[in-house]
Amino acid sequence: MKSPAAPDAPATQAAIKFDRRYEDAAVEDLWHLWTTKEGFGSWWGPKGFRVEVRKLDLREGGELFYDMIAAAPEEIAAMKKMNMPLTHATRGTFARIEPLKHLELIHVIDFIPGVKSYEHRIVVEFSISGRGAQMVITVEPHHNAEWTKMATMGMESQLTKLPGVLAHMNSGR
């Protein structure tokens, strides 16, 4: 089931896919990073931001609450320039869960000044890939092309954190 379209979302915007393979990682590792407070908090958010996960209830209909916090000086300055808060509460719901295979998360986008609140869906598919694990993330477009571009850059940025987080996880084994 598709979430309601973002207000004013151009029909020409397509969903964005991120296909990542991680050698020497297990699907269970990637699943952990999406589905636990500790895991999600270890990598979510673009570089220069951090999150504090307040609630993660992993079940269909379960809630995810976290604070997205601008932490680096450049990001703080950029947020101020855009008249955006340095910290904003973010909430979402787990829409569909197939353990170690499929995860759908619907965020409520309600923090953009002058834009009506809307839902934004992220779908993640997990699989084994050679000696490692693969995840394909599909992200719906946002309310306009500019925000879709910023969100794409943000996802690209936060995905660069995963190799280090996975290496740290594997060093503890």
For the regions a language model picked out, list residue spans one by one.
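A short, structured loop/turn motif at beta-sheet edges
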Residues: 26-28, 56-61, 95-102, 125-134, ...
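Hydrophobic pocket/interface hotspot
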Residues: 30, 40, 64-66, 94, ...
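Short, highly charged C-terminal tails/helix-capping segments
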Residues: 164-173
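Beta-strand/loop substructures that line and gate deep hydrophobic ligand-binding cavities in soluble
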Residues: 95-96, 104-156
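Short, surface-exposed coil-to-beta transition loops
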Residues: 17, 51, 87-91, 117-122
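Short beta-edge strand/loop motif at the mouth of beta-sheet-based domains
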Residues: 18, 38-87
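Hydrophobic ligand-binding cavity/cleft-lining segments
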Residues: 1-55
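Short, P/G- and charge-enriched loop/turn segments at secondary-structure junctions
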Residues: 4-7, 76-83, 111-113
